[in-house]
Every structure is written in C-alpha cells, then in structure tokens.
C-alpha cells in the first residue's frame, strides 16, 4: 500500500480573482450571458507519487495561470398550468498552467454544465407542490487531474398550510449518488485513479414561519432641481 500524507507549502501566496460578466435579457425572462474569470495565484491541492519510494503527497500549490471563459443561457418555460420549469446551460473553456513539483502542465479543456429546475403544482387548494431538479457537469480538468463528469438529482415536497406565513419542506439531495467525484492522473511518472466515496445523499425537513408583516418605510422623493430637471 502507498503511504499518503499532506505536504506543506511555505511559498503559497494569496489568491486573487478578477471577474467580468455581461448579460442580455430578452422579453424580460430569457437571459443570455458571457463571462470571464482570471485567477492570480490560483490555489488547488494536487497529488504527487514519489518516484523513489512507496509514498505519495497531497500539496496545495499556486498555478501560474487559471482562466475560465464561457457563455450561459437561462430559459424559463411552463407546461400547462401545473408545471413551471427553468433550463440553464453553460459552456466553458478552462486554462490551467503551472509546475507541480517536477511536473510542468499547460492544459485547456472545453466542457459544459446543464441544469433543469421543475416545480409541479400538486394541489392549488392545499398549496402543495413538488420540486424536482437535475444538474450535470461534463468531464473537466484541474491542474494535472482529469475529472469525470458528475450529476445530481434532488427532490423536495413543499406544503404551505398558511400562505405567506408557514411553509414545510421535505427535501432529498443526490438521490442517485452522482456526486462522487472521480479523478485520474496520466503522466509518465504519475498514474493514479481516485474516487471520493463520501456519501453526499441527505434528507432534510425544514419548517419556516414568518412573524408579522414587513412594513416599508415611505421613500423620500429626491430633489432633482439641482440637476436642472
């Protein structure tokens, strides 16, 4: 068996992020956007197998470059009067560059993410609805890692016995156990496959009660005479 341990990094520097985003809203409901993220000293933990001994290390390092560029779209729609849905799609380009111990890497990867949110009205009279959501992320990269795709299916039953006052939600997450991340490393001196077996499934019961009413303060009119209006 390989002995694994955490290896410190006294040269680790703080990470900074610069983000830019532009959105266009069509007919007050369809959203289309472009975005770019530039990371300086991007920090991630990577895995290294010692070439001279039967041991391995986990170490957090700074990447020389980590950029993401992408486009997204949000499409809401209804099916009859009982189903309200929202479809979200995004496509991204990842750029990772740096040196991890003695392994230089310069990689690019195109991948996508799909999400679908659905609300089914089971009973308007009893204020009972069912939420079923699904998400899929295509295979991507992280430094020297190749990361397999992951998916999540969740569902929640929502009951509002007192509208705008009391709500009860029973919710389940990761119903199909699709959030178990799998990574692969395939370099001349580094070959490994890793699966995170932590169980991410969960069931929760939420009770929410709103006390009183929110009274909005009267807004004062702005004196625009000084602007020549």
State the predicted function of each range.
Residues 114-160, 166, 171-177, 184-188:
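C-terminal beta-barrel architecture of Gram-negative outer-membrane proteins
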Residues 7, 13, 31-88, 97-113:
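Outer membrane beta-barrel strand-and-loop segments of large Gram-negative receptors
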Residues 12, 20-26, 71-77, 116-120, ...:
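Residues on the lipid-exposed face of transmembrane beta-strands in outer-membrane beta-barrel proteins
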Residues 16-20, 26, 65-69, 106-114, ...:
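Residues that define the transmembrane beta-barrel architecture of outer-membrane proteins
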Residues 28, 36-40, 91-97, 120, ...:
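Transmembrane beta-strands of outer-membrane beta-barrel pores
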């Amino acid at each position: 068996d390989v002995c694994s341990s955490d290896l410190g990094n006294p040269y680790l520097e703080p990470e900074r992020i610069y983000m830019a985003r532009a959105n266009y809203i069509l007919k007050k409901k369809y959203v289309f956007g472009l975005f770019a993220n530039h990371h300086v000293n991007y920090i991630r933990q990577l895995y290294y197998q010692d070439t001279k001994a039967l041991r391995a290390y986990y170490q957090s390092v700074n990447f020389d470059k980590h950029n993401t560029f992408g486009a997204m779209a949000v499409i809401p729609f209804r099916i009859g009067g009982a189903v309200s849905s929202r479809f979200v799609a995004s496509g991204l380009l990842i750029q990772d560059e740096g040196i991890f111990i003695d392994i230089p890497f310069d990689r690019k990867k195109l991948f996508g993410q799909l999400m679908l949110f659905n609300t089914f009205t089971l009973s308007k009279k009893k204020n009972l609805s069912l939420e079923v959501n699904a998400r899929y992320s295509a295979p991507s990269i992280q430094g020297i890692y190749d990361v397999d795709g992951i998916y999540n299916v969740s569902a929640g039953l929502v009951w509002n016995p007192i509208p705008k006052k009391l709500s009860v939600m029973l919710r389940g997450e990761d119903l199909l156990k699709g959030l178990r991340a799998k990574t692969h490393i395939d370099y001349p001196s580094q070959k490994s496959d890793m699966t995170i077996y932590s169980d991410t499934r969960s069931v929760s019961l939420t009770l929410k009660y709103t006390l009183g009413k929110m009274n909005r303060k009267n807004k004062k009119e702005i004196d625009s005479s000084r602007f020549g209006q």
